[in-house]
Structures are given as C-alpha cells and as structure tokens.
C-alpha cells in the first residue's frame, strides 16, 4: 500500500465554478488560467474537463502549452509571458499557440522571424501594475508594426492586468480600468482585463474576454471572503490518513522543540503529511484538519513528512482514518490565513511526491 498522502481533484466542482464564472460574466469568452500545473490542481486532471467548454487555456510559457497539447486537448493555448527567445516563435505557430507581446524585444523577434503561418498575438499594456506591458503611448507603433507584418494574424487582442483587484476598495482599480477603456487605437479586435477578483467586483472590466484563475479552482481571491461566500466549490482536496496513535503521559512534549504539551494525559495522532508535501510549516495554534466528520487541532510543529493532532477528546479515531488537510470541509483560505500567506501559494507548493487521485 502506498503512502496515503494524495490530492483528490473534483471535476464536478471545476464545472460548477466555471458555471458560476459564466453566470457572473454572461456572454463573455473565457480564458481558463491553467499555469503552474493548473494552480497545483494538475493540468492532466483539469485540462480534459475544460476542453471544448472555454475559449482558450492561459499558460505562462511554451513548455506548459506543449504539456497541454500532449494530452490531446484541442482548445487553444495562450502564452501569457510570450516567448523567451525568437526560436520559440516557430514552435508556437506550428502548434497554433497565441503569444502575448509585452516588451519591445519580443516585438523585434517577431518582426525579424518570418513564420510559415500567421501567429495569433495579444498585446499587453501597462496601465499601472508596472510589471509587464507596453506603455500606452507606445501602442500605436506596436499596432503599426503588427499590421504590416505578414505573418501576424490580424485578430489582435489587447490586455492589461490589475494590480489591486483583490482589494476592491483601492482607487487604483478604477484608475486602471478607466485607462484601459480609454485606449482608442484601432486594430485591437478583442480586449481582456478581468481576472478572478475583477470578474466578481468590477463587472465593467469584463470587456470581451475574462481570465479566471483561482476562482476556477474554488478558492476566493479575497482575504475577507472564502469560497462558500462566493458560491464556489473547492476543486482540490489535500488528503492523508492517520498512520499512528500514541497515548502520552501528562506534560509529554510533542514534536521538534517540544513546543506543545498537555497538563493531562493526551492521545496524539500522527498524520502522514508535512512541509515536504507542501503543507505549511508555520501555522497558528489550533489549525484544524478534518477527521471523522469533525475538526481536530494540529499540535506541535509540522515536520517534513508528518504532523501531529490532538485526539484526546476523540477516542473513536483510529489508525487508517482519512484526514482532510484542506478542501471541502477545511477551506484552504483558512489554512492560508493561519500560515500568513494566500491560497494561491498553498495550492502551488504541493510537492511532486503527492500523488493525484
């Protein structure tokens, strides 16, 4: 029998969340962001479920797009960081991948690299995030260059990215949206600005195409709301099992550093999961897991391969019982808050030794 630490991916939850997105953005095309192994949920598990139900898959790089194509998935892919060298352009066009152009060097590569077929492109403009994107005043020259290049598909898109969408009260959001909407250069035939947070908070930003990421996987993009608040269902269940149970005397120190002890006899369960699997090491006291239909608190430090839970008040729990680390019952947003981070990071840091099921 293999180690019980695993990810359970729920296709029905994925489809429910996609339905919620389409309800919030009626009539809009959907680019499903599946970069970083579908936010840790597994591109092998996610892409076939979404194939044919969306406009395109959004990935960070060529390698991620090729991995999707190798699955036999036919939905188009868009490289959101574009190409990292001119050599990648021919591979992209041969596989019908669209490329985001965000820098003059990428535009130069494109203009100087004749291609056998017209390549689909999106132009990224910087409206205030100051990370990637052309300046607004550069867009006309970019468009002129693309229009005169015979190996560029003329269905050119324009996109930007909001820096503070997860904080809807920030004035920068409306400033960026307004700047984007004021761009009147002809030739851009489709536009996109809305990520998960903007889809929910700024309907006026939805434009032609929306780009859901974290909400697709049933996780809230906001610090003060969870998946249930937004009508989303977690796609990932991070699971393990009780591998050992020990009855300890009063004041027995548990785990590295002896950071936890009880003034009465305690019953400690060992769960086969730790920071080597992607569970955060630094969590606050009484962070829960879900066992036998109830929450049980983690005690002591999280180790590389295991963590310990207090079963003193739960005598019915046995070795082999299933444990949910996060998922349907214990939302990942809660664990992220306990660890002082965000759900995105926890999903993406699941290690390779955790198997998908």
UniProtKB/Swiss-Prot annotation:
Q: Which residues bind substrate?
A: 131, 304
Q: Which GO terms describe its molecular function?
A: alanine racemase activity; pyridoxal phosphate binding
Any one Gene Ontology BP term: D-alanine biosynthetic process
* Cofactors named for this entry: pyridoxal 5'-phosphate
Q: Is Isomerase set as a keyword in this record?
A: yes
Assigned EC number: 5.1.1.1
Q: CDD domains, alphabetically? A: PLPDE_III_AR_proteobact (cd06827)
Question: What does the protein in this record do?
Answer: Catalyzes the interconversion of L-alanine and D-alanine. May also act on other amino acids.
In Swiss-Prot or TrEMBL terms, this protein is called: Alanine racemase
The gene name reads alr
């Amino acid at each position: 029998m293999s180690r019980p630490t695993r990810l359970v991916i729920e296709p029905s939850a994925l489809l429910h969340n996609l339905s919620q997105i389409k309800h919030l953005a009626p009539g809009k095309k959907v680019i499903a962001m599946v970069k970083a192994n579908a936010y840790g949920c597994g591109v092998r598990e996610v892409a076939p479920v979404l194939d044919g139900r969306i406009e395109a898959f959004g990935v960070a790089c060529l390698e991620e797009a090729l991995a999707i194509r190798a699955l036999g998935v036919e939905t188009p892919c868009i490289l959101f960081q574009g190409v990292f060298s001119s050599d990648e352009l021919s591979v992209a066009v041969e596989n019908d991948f669209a490329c985001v152009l965000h820098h003059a060097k990428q535009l130069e590569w494109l203009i100087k690299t004749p291609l056998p077929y017209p390549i689909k492109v999106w132009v990224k403009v910087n409206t205030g995030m100051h990370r990637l994107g052309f300046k607004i005043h550069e867009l006309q020259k970019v468009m002129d260059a693309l229009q005169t290049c015979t190996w560029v598909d003329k269905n050119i898109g324009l996109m930007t990215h909001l820096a503070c969408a997860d904080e809807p009260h920030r004035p920068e959001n409306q400033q960026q949206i307004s700047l984007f909407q004021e761009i009147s250069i002809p030739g851009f035939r489709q536009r996109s600005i809305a990520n998960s947070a903007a889809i929910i908070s700024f309907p006026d930003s939805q434009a032609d195409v929306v780009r859901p990421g974290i909400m697709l996987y049933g996780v809230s993009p906001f610090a003060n709301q969870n998946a249930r608040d937004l009508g989303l269902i977690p796609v990932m269940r991070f699971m393990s099992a009780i591998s050992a149970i020990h009855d300890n005397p009063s004041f027995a120190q548990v785990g590295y550093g002896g950071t936890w002890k009880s003034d009465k006899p305690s019953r400690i369960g060992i769960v086969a999961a730790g920071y080597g699997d992607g569970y955060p090491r630094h969590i606050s006291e009484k962070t829960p897991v879900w066992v036998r239909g109830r929450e049980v608190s983690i005690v002591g430090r999280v180790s590389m391969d295991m963590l310990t839970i207090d079963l003193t008040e739960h005598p019915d729990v046995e070795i082999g019982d299933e444990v949910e680390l996060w998922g349907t019952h214990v939302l990942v947003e809660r664990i992220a808050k306990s660890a002082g981070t965000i759900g995105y990071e926890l999903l993406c840091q699941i290690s390779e030794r955790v198997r998908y099921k």
